[in-house]
């Protein structure tokens, strides 16, 4: 291509292009690399905008395999074009300049005329080049204006302005394509130098094109391997960017042209086969001609560290590596950073300490958070106090209503069977109370097991009407109404009966979620006091999923699947665990695939279902179960069956391993929960449904037992043996229960997977039925002698299953008959002396015939259709002839002929006693390791359940009961009406809501008494700390405390003995603030043990335990003086502590850590006031008289509270002193409080008379001042009116 053609192609480029043409001498006559033209054009089309118009012929002339030769001496030969590789050309072409530096016209190392305008571009001998090529300055002038430089950026000290070196400078090296990104229509990128070489006739080198293609593939393979094994491209690209930016500010001084020529020759050799050596900092950068001018303005040298060169590769192969990395970084932003465009680098200094401003800001934030948390806590305390007062007021209202309502008492007295039902002359006895409670329980039916009714009346009249209506129908809507009816009846009969309420106010402390999280250190997350933020938790989710996938992989590794298949299914297995946990809620939906895959997913999910079931049962056994926790067992078993049906598995796929593990786990679960929990009747239906589902499942598994043997693995056969051993143990227990008197376990079917279940597990599934009116299905204990034996046998019969109970009742028939003949079992005949025939006709005729008519017993109609084995034979034969008539002769509401069955009684949720847990199995079967591993993690699974039960309180909790005073026993007797028990503190504590912190007794004289110490087992340790401060509570209930009687004194002594007889606490923390015991380490600053050799009550960890009575308060001399006591002479301080900081007026500093001597009460004596002599009042150092107590008044003086007496005494020249009665702290200091004056006795009358005269004079003066002010105001008003009238007359306005 000729020079004219080349100029026509690049007509829009630069007007000063002819200036840059070097001399016509060409060294070597080498042509450019035209073989790279095609590849370069392809790269240019995929690269930056603005290069689309370039022709392939011109673009191919950019690259050259060989390095440029240096300029020899001062010869005016044309320099050979710089030998830049294709890698450097495209790398610099598509790399925009960094954001942080201003752009400059061109590079310094290129030695172009435009580079001289840059501040950093110091091109030597540039002026000489201009002189040599001056005639070519007449091309386009418009392009020159685009590259004009601000004169402020010129470097006047550069060699450009040195005139002596103009002729010696070599021809400059230039780049015609500099700034090509700013030209949109440019089609030519080569200078005249490349066209001159084109004329030389050099041939194309096609080998370079093939080498470029091969190196491209090799580079891609190397990069793909490097992404997997070596450091990611992100780090490499970041290193390149940092090195490039570090080179921006370096100023290079070229030493000589010979050094440049020598280094160019070295690059030639390196490009032909030798490994590329890193150039020095002074070496010119091998930047491409196609690179943007902005890069060349900033970058004089590009370090070789930015280019990765492989041994044996050409320069073009080196380019392929870097370019491929850059292109891949643009395509995949997730792996490598985007190094194009504006770039900012921020280096995080994590190891440095925070600055003072950051510390101040952090401390301020922490202070604000602490203040807000304190406000939240204070607000919660106020809510606690308000709710407590509201509940106290409500209970007082109902107690007053029951005592003042005569109509309610009259209505309840009509319920009595005879006039002889009142207490005897001896008073209330235990025998009478037991008969009375049993009769009342059978007479009044309980409709709902809830404590409160659904609709509670608002006014007193509505409450009375509701109670009267229930008394008339002989039924109670809820437990509260039944208790109210009993209290009204007992008080009407003359017994001392009081209402006991377990108050449940709002929590004393707010929940942790309600507080603002406070971190002790901003960077330390482990020491934070609260949980992390939601964003942090979301970031940690993938980490947890990876950890959760590890156990799944371990389980699947036991199967025959290859390792490659495991890697492919890792993600699915990691999701198997959360999916299987969600099956307990019935939300799992899985898809069936191949047979081995389904088997493994089934094994994982079923194991996790078992784990959740076992842990839910464990948590429900520890705490009193609530309504939310009850459906858990049934839902888990139903979800297990639904899981099998959804998977679409045949019986062959149901492995014996799953069945055996389910059997073992369910047996362990039921026995463990029955041992620890006081399960309520709401929990039993769920147990029955779970047992039913397990039975159906095991029946299916047993039907396909032969087919399972073919599929079972060695681990499954091992579990089979354990399940068979378990069945043997259960059958042995059944056989032993038939022979022994006390059954150990309940009989279980051979196909039943449940061992040690309660009776409810064997009952048929419940059918939907209408709610019926039922009473309490518990047979009360009427025997008052041999209480321990009866309790043991009673608990055995309750815990056994129906079949075992039937056998036990048959064995104990004789014993039951002998007991039933005892008069203690019966209500006295006088209590039920009169009967009505009409009531007898309502009973069952068959039972009436079987019952003996000679004795009157308690009516068992409320258990007429209970399980036959549950009833005693002597009582089961009793007819309804024992129905109790009414005194008023009114028609009674007839009882139903048939009582509901035992299942209905259980479903009615009326009693807790029937469903007490069974006895624990002594020899439990050996559990598999999988079950033991699951037990370790149950605490994590139980947190959600415990939190839910804590929020939802049980609606059937018995937080109300009754206490009756026994004259014979001389104590208050607690009664559980719903179970018919007396002296049942433990039963009441179990049935009440946990946390008995406020148990108050509301007596018949409208007074209030705190009886928490009787019912709270941990009153002295934990519950006492859960209450509000004692001072506030005492002040609140003080108006409602009755006068102290003999009964109160006796009760207080009993309450004190309850805790004094208990053993010592087991931990050191429980001794802190204990009301009875103390450790020396827990003594406060002003406390001490006296006597010094106080007797020890025990030891804990080698530390002596003392009585709280030995702890005494110690005070300093000044504090004892305020109590009118002084330290005895010669007494040594019992203890020396650090005094509080004091302000020294002389030095105006705060004195700290001064020793303070403190003394005990036994080291002090009463204060003896001094005597006034010669009319002078004795004073202290401050001129005042300390009168903290009346006894501290000095002798022969009087205390006169007359204001202004000091002024009168000064006039009369009589000694007088101020009386200090205390100190007040305000305005940041302590100020004395004065009250009156102290004068001698002989001056009392004189001073008093003078003060009265002075008061009269003061009154006259005040009157004169008042009159003067009034007259003066009138005078001003009159004068003002006169002036106004005069102005009106004068100016007419």
From Swiss-Prot:
Gene3D superfamilies linked: Rad4, beta-hairpin domain BHD1, Rad4, beta-hairpin domain BHD3, Transglutaminase-like
SUPFAM superfamilies noted in UniProt: Cysteine proteinases
GO molecular function: damaged DNA binding; single-stranded DNA binding
Low complexity bias (residue ranges): 51-60, 580-594, 658-692
UniProt region (Disordered), positions on chain: 1-199, 217-239, 255-341, 514-640, 658-919
Basic and acidic residues biased stretches: 18-30, 520-578, 598-612, 693-711, 806-818
Bias type Polar residues, positions: 101-130, 226-238, 720-737
PANTHER family cross-referenced by the UniProt entry: DNA REPAIR PROTEIN COMPLEMENTING XP-C CELLS, DNA REPAIR PROTEIN XP-C / RAD4
Span(s) of short sequence motif Nuclear localization signal: 922-938, 1195-1211, 1275-1291
Origin superkingdom: Eukaryota
Biased composition regions of type Acidic residues, renumbered to the chain: 31-43, 313-335
Basic residues bias (residue ranges): 288-301
Record's subunit section: Heterodimer.
Biological-process GO terms, alphabetical: meiotic mismatch repair involved in reciprocal meiotic recombination; mismatch repair; nucleotide-excision repair
Keyword set, alphabetical order: DNA damage, DNA repair, DNA-binding, Nucleus, Phosphoprotein
Cellular component, GO, one term: cytosol
Name of the protein in question: DNA repair protein complementing XP-C cells homolog
């Amino acid at each position: 291509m000729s020079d004219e053609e080349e100029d026509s192609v690049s007509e829009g480029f630069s007007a000063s292009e002819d200036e840059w043409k070097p001399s016509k001498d060409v060294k070597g006559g080498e042509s450019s690399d035209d073989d790279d033209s095609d590849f370069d054009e392809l790269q240019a089309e995929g690269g930056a905008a603005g290069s689309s118009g370039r022709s392939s012929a011109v673009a191919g002339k950019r690259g050259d395999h060989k390095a440029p030769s240096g300029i020899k001496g001062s010869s005016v030969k044309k320099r050979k074009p710089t030998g830049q590789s294709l890698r450097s050309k495209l790398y610099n072409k598509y790399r925009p300049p960094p954001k942080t530096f201003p752009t400059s016209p061109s590079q310094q190392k290129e030695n172009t005329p435009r580079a001289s305008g840059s501040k950093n571009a110091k091109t030597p001998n540039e002026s000489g080049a201009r002189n040599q090529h001056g005639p070519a300055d007449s091309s386009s002038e418009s392009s020159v204006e685009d590259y004009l430089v601000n004169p402020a950026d010129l470097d006047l000290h550069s060699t450009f302005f040195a005139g002596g070196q103009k002729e010696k400078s070599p021809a400059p090296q230039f780049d015609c394509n500099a700034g090509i990104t700013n030209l949109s229509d440019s089609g030519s990128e080569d200078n005249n130098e490349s066209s001159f070489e084109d004329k030389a006739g050099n041939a194309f080198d096609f080998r370079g094109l093939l080498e470029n293609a091969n190196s491209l593939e090799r580079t891609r393979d190397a990069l793909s391997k490097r992404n997997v094994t070596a450091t990611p491209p992100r780090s490499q690209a970041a290193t390149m960017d940092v090195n490039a930016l570090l080179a921006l500010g370096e100023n290079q001084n070229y030493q000589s042209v010979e050094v440049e020529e020598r280094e160019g020759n070295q690059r030639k050799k390196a490009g032909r086969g030798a490994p590329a050596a890193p150039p020095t900092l002074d070496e010119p950068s091998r930047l491409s001609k196609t690179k943007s001018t902005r890069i060349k303005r900033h970058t004089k040298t590009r370090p070789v560290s930015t280019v990765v060169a492989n041994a044996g590769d050409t320069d073009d192969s080196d380019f392929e590596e870097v370019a491929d990395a850059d292109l891949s970084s643009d395509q995949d932003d997730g792996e490598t950073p985007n190094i194009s465009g504006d770039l900012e680098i921020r280096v995080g200094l994590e190891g440095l300490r925070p600055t003072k401003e950051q510390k101040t800001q952090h401390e301020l934030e922490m202070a604000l958070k602490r203040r807000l948390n304190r406000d939240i806590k204070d607000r919660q305390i106020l809510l606690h106090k308000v709710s407590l007062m509201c509940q106290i007021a409500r209970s007082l209202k109902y107690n007053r209503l029951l005592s003042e309502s005569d109509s309610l008492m009259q209505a309840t007295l009509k319920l009595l069977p005879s006039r002889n039902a009142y207490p005897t002359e001896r008073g209330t006895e235990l025998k009478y109370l037991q008969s009375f409670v049993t009769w009342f329980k059978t007479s009044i039916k309980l409709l709902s097991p809830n404590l409160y009714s659904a609709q509670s009346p608002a006014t007193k009249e509505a409450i009375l009407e509701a109670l009267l209506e229930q008394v008339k129908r002989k039924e109670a809507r809820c437990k509260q109404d039944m208790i109210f009816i009993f209290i009204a009846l007992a008080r009407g009969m003359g017994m001392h009966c009081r209402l006991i309420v377990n108050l449940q106010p709002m929590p004393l402390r707010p929940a942790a979620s309600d507080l603002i999280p406070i971190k002790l250190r901003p960077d330390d997350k482990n020491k934070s006091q609260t949980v992390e933020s939601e964003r942090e938790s979301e970031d940690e989710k993938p980490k947890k999923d990876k950890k959760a996938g590890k156990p799944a992989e371990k389980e699947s590794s036991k199967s025959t699947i290859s390792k490659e298949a495991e890697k492919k299914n890792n993600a699915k297995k990691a999701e198997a665990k959360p999916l299987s946990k969600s099956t307990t809620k019935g939300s799992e939906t899985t898809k069936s695939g191949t047979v081995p895959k389904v088997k493994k997913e089934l094994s994982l999910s079923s194991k996790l279902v078992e784990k959740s079931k076992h842990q839910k049962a464990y948590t429900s056994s520890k705490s009193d179960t609530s309504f939310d926790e009850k459906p858990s067992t049934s839902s888990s078993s139903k979800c297990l069956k639904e899981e099998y049906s959804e998977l679409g598995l045949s019986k062959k796929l149901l492995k014996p391993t799953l069945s055996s593990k389910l059997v073992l786990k369910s047996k362990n679960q039921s026995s463990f929960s029955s041992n620890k929990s006081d399960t309520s009747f709401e929990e039993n239906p769920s147990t029955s449904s779970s047992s039913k589902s397990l039975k159906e499942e095991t029946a299916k598994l047993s039907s396909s037992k032969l087919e399972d043997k073919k599929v079972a693995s060695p681990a499954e056969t091992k579990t089979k043996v354990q399940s068979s051993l378990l069945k043997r143990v259960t059958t042995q227990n059944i056989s032993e229960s038939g022979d022994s008197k006390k059954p150990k376990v309940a009989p279980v079917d051979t196909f039943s997977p449940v061992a040690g279940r309660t009776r409810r597990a064997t009952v048929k599934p419940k059918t939907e039925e209408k709610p019926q009116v039922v009473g309490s299905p518990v047979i009360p204990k009427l025997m008052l002698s041999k209480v321990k034996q009866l309790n043991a046998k009673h608990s055995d019969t309750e815990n056994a299953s129906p079949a075992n109970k039937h056998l036990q009742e048959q064995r104990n028939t004789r014993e039951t008959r002998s007991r039933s003949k005892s008069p203690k079992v019966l209500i006295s005949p006088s209590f039920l002396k009169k009967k009505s025939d009409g009531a007898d006709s309502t009973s069952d005729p068959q039972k009436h015939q079987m019952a003996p008519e000679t004795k009157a017993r308690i009516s068992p109609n409320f258990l007429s259709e209970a399980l036959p084995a549950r009833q005693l034979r002597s009582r089961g034969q009793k007819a309804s002839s024992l129905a109790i008539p009414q005194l008023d002769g009114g028609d009674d509401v007839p009882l139903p002929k048939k009582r509901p069955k035992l299942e209905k009684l259980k479903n009615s949720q009326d009693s807790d006693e029937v469903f007490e847990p069974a006895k624990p199995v002594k020899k439990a079967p050996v559990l598999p390791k999988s079950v033991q591993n699951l037990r370790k993690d149950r605490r994590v699974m139980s947190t959600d359940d415990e939190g839910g039960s804590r929020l939802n309180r049980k609606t059937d909790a018995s937080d109300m009961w009754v206490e009756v005073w026994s004259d014979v026993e001389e104590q208050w007797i607690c009664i559980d009406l719903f179970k018919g028990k007396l002296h049942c503190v433990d039963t009441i504590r179990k049935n009440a809501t946990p946390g008995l912190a406020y148990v108050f007794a509301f007596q018949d004289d409208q007074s209030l008494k705190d009886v928490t110490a009787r019912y709270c087992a941990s009153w002295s340790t934990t519950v006492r700390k859960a209450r509000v401060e004692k001072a506030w509570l005492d002040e609140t209930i003080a108006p409602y405390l009755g006068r102290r009687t003999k009964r109160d004194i006796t009760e207080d002594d009993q309450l004190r003995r309850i805790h004094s007889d208990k053993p010592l606490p087991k931990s050191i923390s429980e001794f802190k603030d204990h009301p009875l015991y103390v450790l020396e380490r827990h003594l406060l600053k002003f406390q001490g043990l006296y006597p010094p050799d106080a007797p020890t009550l025990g030891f804990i960890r080698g530390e002596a335990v003392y009585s709280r009575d030995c702890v005494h308060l110690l005070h300093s001399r000044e504090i004892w003086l305020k109590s009118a006591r002084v330290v005895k002479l010669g007494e040594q301080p019992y203890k020396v502590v650090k005094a509080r900081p004091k302000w020294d007026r002389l030095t105006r500093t705060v004195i700290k850590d001064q020793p303070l001597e403190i003394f005990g009460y036994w080291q002090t004596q009463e204060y003896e006031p001094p005597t006034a002599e010669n009319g002078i009042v004795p004073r202290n150092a401050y001129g005042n008289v300390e009168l903290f107590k009346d006894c501290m008044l000095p002798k022969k003086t009087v205390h006169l509270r007359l204001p202004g007496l000091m002024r009168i005494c000064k006039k009369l020249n009589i000694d007088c002193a101020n009386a200090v009665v205390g100190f007040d702290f305000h305005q940041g200091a302590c100020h004395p409080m004065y009250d009156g004056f102290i004068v001698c006795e002989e001056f009392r009358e004189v001073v008093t008379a003078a003060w009265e005269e002075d008061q009269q004079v003061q009154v006259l003066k005040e009157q004169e001042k008042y009159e003067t002010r009034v007259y003066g105001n009138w005078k001003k008003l009159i004068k003002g009116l006169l002036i106004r009238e005069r102005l009106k007359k004068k100016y007419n306005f």
